[in-house]
Design a protein with these regions (language model features):
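Short beta-strand/loop motif that positions the catalytic acidic residue
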Residues: 272-274
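N-terminal cap/lid segment of alpha/beta-hydrolase-fold proteins
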Residues: 3-41, 45
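Accessory cap/linker subdomain of secreted extracellular hydrolases
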Residues: 55, 59, 63-81, 85-92, ...
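Catalytic histidine neighborhood in serine/cysteine hydrolases
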Residues: 293-308
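Conserved alpha/beta-hydrolase
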Residues: 92-112
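Alpha/beta-hydrolase fold nucleophile elbow
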Residues: 139-152
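Short glycine-enriched nucleophile-adjacent loop
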Residues: 153-165, 171, 289
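Alpha/beta-hydrolase active-site loop
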Residues: 86-87, 97, 119-139
């Protein structure tokens, strides 16, 4: 089997297409994993697009978080082999049996997708748009694409919904900040160092080109960061200097506005799920989104406990 080429297998009650190529409007090819019912048909799609390496198991990427969650909430693991659990996105084993297709796309420059990493940028948002429209016209799709995910996978839903993709039918923003300046980089006008630390720990470790220095999938044993192994200077040239960029924009300027929600443009039916904790990041975005989005159909829920626990429980 050629490494990191599209391939299909049937296992655990699903038809799985690994590393499906998805071509962007500038010609760059991203890679997606598609989990779908074994039977033929056209089904609604749940899509996520983000930087955490689609093939990296939750248990391998975030072992302490996984262990705490399953010890305190053992129902998380019920009804699933948990082989396909991945950080902050849906478990396909719990959705595919209900006739959904689950699509996970590695964002530009991350996981198995090459390119330049520039988080929450207009380029990334356009990629997300292209992925939604791609999913909406596939032979296994009924043309209705929903978005669902936590944190990063929620934040970028606000952004892409502002572009109004024709095939976007609904969105579930689970703990997703919205105002790049106020929620994320400058709390009360004061610089937050969270993003620089996050970049080092959660993005650089799964950047495309980490290759043999990265992890392998516990499902298919392929490298989760693509077939190439790039040098440190090559990797650095393929990503924005995120912490420096944020620090160089101390005011709420065009840099921040380009990475923030445009509420009057968001008309998609939405479910906004906030956490009473995590005050330094997400809750404001969820409440603001519910109040200010132009969507006619919108719902708000607020929960406690950890960042992700309720998302994975029934």
């Amino acid at each position: 089997m050629a490494s990191h080429q599209q391939r299909t297998e049937i296992r655990d009650g699903m038809r799985i297409d690994w590393d499906v190529p998805v071509t962007m409007d500038d010609g760059l090819v991203l890679r997606a994993d598609v989990f779908r019912p074994v039977k033929d048909g056209k089904f609604p799609v749940i899509l996520s697009y983000g930087p955490y390496a689609k093939s990296l198991a939750f248990q391998d990427g975030y072992p302490s978080a996984w262990q705490r969650m399953v010890e305190k909430h053992p129902d998380v693991t019920a009804g699933s082999s948990n082989l396909y659990q991945s950080w902050e996105v849906v478990d396909p084993e719990k959705w595919v049996p209900h006739d959904y297709v689950c699509v996970r796309v590695d964002s530009r420059g991350a996981g198995c997708s090459p390119g330049f990493i520039d988080h929450f940028s207009p380029r990334e948002t356009k990629d997300f748009y292209d992925c939604i429209e791609w999913a909406g016209v596939q032979p296994w799709s009924n043309g209705k694409v929903g978005l669902n995910g936590i944190s990063y996978y929620g934040i970028n839903q606000w952004h892409v919904a502002s572009l109004q993709p024709p095939h976007l039918a609904a969105m579930c923003v689970w703990e997703g900040a919205a105002d790049w300046y106020r929620d994320m980089t400058h709390h009360g006008g004061m610089l937050s160092t969270f993003w620089e630390n996050w970049y080092d720990m959660q993005v650089k470790t799964v950047q495309y080109g980490a290759g043999e220095r990265g992890k392998r999938s516990r499902v298919h044993a392929e490298l989760v960061c693509g077939p190439e192994t790039l040098s440190d200077p090559e990797l650095a040239r393929n990503r924005a200097d995120f912490g420096t960029e944020i620090a160089s924009h101390p005011m709420d300027d065009d840099y921040h506005k380009a990475r923030s929600a445009k509420w009057d443009k968001i008309v998609t039916p939405l479910f906004s799920a906030a956490n009473w904790g995590g005050q330094g990041l997400h809750p404001r975005g969820n409440f603001e989104g519910f109040v200010r989005a132009a969507s006619k159909q919108k719902w708000l829920e607020a929960h406690g406990i950890e960042h992700w626990t309720h998302f994975y429980t029934d």
